[in-house]
Amino acid sequence: MRKKIVAGNWKMNTLPAEGVELAKEVAAGRKDVCDAVTMIVCPPFTHLYSVIETLKGANIAVGAQDCATEVKGAYTGEVSAEMIAALGCEYVILGHSERRQYYGETSETLNKKMARAYENNLKPIYCVGENLEEREAGRHFEVCKQQIEEVVFNLTEEQFESLVIAYEPVWAIGTGKTATAEQAEEIHAYIREVLRSKFGAKAEECPILYGGSCKPSNAGEIFSKENVDGGLIGGAALKAEDFLGIGKAF
């Protein structure tokens, strides 16, 4: 049985006090979401610690939104995987489309970040997906396959066991557009097929999250698909009621 996951990516939103308040609201409603669903929140670096402290004992994991390629040293402004892990983070988002688009992250960069994450026992949530131009050109399978082969295929079988994949239809993020449940299932099934070609039966255990515009009103339909194991949630994660509503959609 694959793990069911709802992960909230807060992006560059909330000030520390607001983040703590949001975490408290999510914690208060956690009891209404099935225990079998793994709930994760990923706040900005500035309030990772306070959110982790707030959520102690709440059965909600905390992740970071990124980590540095390097271990430590003269890298002004960077935050290392070791620092994140020392705070008590369990997960780290890597390869988000916004990092690829705005900060030029490449497979080379992401292989380094992936290595740092595993060195510090962080579980990566690795993002793949195509933009509108690539989708309209019919290249969505090709793009996702390349992003997996160039990074995920470098993992050992043991490392792969703790990996989470998030499929982001980049054309559906922040645009209000949503891939249909059928479109989501089609590409999730393909991603699992690609993983199977390298990792065999272990691919059946890898959670693949949908990272488009997911909300309580459409989550149930999307999550009902065989190869959709949850969601990497953006905007809806900033409202506790919506985030919890998505968690109840299984």
What is the predicted function of each stretch?
Residues M1-F250:
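Active-site loop-to-helix "anion-binding N-cap" substructures in soluble metabolic enzymes
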